[in-house]
Amino acid sequence: MQLLDNLDAALRKLDAQHLRRRRRTAESPCAPHVRVDGRDMLAFCSNDYLGLAAHPVIVAALAEGAARYGAGSGASHLISGHSHAHAQLEERLANMLAPHLEQPRALYFCTGYMANLAVLGALAGRDADIFSEALNHASLIDGARLSRARVQVYPHADLDALADMLAASRAQTRLIVSDGVFSMDGDIAPLRDLLALAERHGAWLVVDDAHGFGVLGEHGRGVLEHAGLRSPHLVLMGTLGKAAGVAGAFVAAHATVIDWLVNRARPYIFSTAAAPAQAHALMASLNLIEGSEGRQRRARLQALAQQLQARLSLRQWRHQPTPTAIQPIVLGANAHALRAAAGLESQGLWVPAIRPPTVPPGTARLRVTLSASHIPAHVDRLADALNQLDNEACHA
């Protein structure tokens, strides 16, 4: 059949470019030590930054929520799927972020991808201008495209270029859209400067804090707390399946923005609500994040990142130290990244290669992600293996 032949040819082309992707099967809970395809591995690739995914308090809360509310919601939020657990979670998130938003409310989504499509589709339209960061996540890129707004991409962290674009815009509705923590690089957006530009030009600042929420700030409130921001111009998206350890995402903003999303955000309106048990479990997760245990876990995570940075002595590869859990090591060629990942796997270390289109061509990398559940001995083992492989690459 010609249609299948065309797909087979396209897959063979991906193989030739070292770009074909295949799934691995984890057979154990998310933790530093995992069983993958029948083999025990030490993982440095999950987004479980605080090590909460298998926390007994959260696991117990999930079971309690399932016993109380059942396995599923049964309908969308605007029909009969909006449970007491969802309402409690949204109120809890709004209160948590109240120091950074005026008249805050929150909206719970099934995924971060859905949340970003919802925000950009509802706030922008044909007559709007979106100014999108060059290294934004795919969900922000797709959300901007689907909004039908005019999209301009500004170079990574280039505030002068963004200021020029804003000054030239004549649109009544303008949105500056940026990751808070860049998912493949681990650096933090210059949010204070972005907010200053948004307020000066009467624009929304939409921040995707998928990798900062729970990790950054004294109370784990993410990049807004880290940068000390408060403004009615802010629209925040955060994920709840990474540092929070469960699933889903939220949008937090001024109450009027949230009311508009409830009425106009198609991904929210036309999707079955997430299981109430997840929302119930997330209440336990947020208590841990904001409490003393959360502070201890964030401090441990920072110490592990500093340890890795101090222990690496790379000559051929390029490590980009960051203040977050994401520590990228750029190798360049796709084949080199795959070879390095295979070399680590042969030593029982799971660090997948990240290749285009996830990262720009020529910047294939190992994306090392740390968790508060790691211990210093884990980091030493990883650093020794990376230094060894880098040394071998120098002499290849």
From Swiss-Prot:
Gene3D superfamilies: Aspartate Aminotransferase, domain 1, Type I PLP-dependent aspartate aminotransferase-like (Major domain). Its cofactor is pyridoxal 5'-phosphate. It comes from the Bacteria. Pfam families: Aminotran_1_2. The gene is bioF. SUPFAM superfamilies: PLP-dependent transferases. The keyword ATP-binding does not apply. It comes from Bordetella petrii (strain ATCC BAA-461 / DSM 12804 / CCUG 43448). The modification N6-(pyridoxal phosphate)lysine is found at residue 242. This is 8-amino-7-oxononanoate synthase.
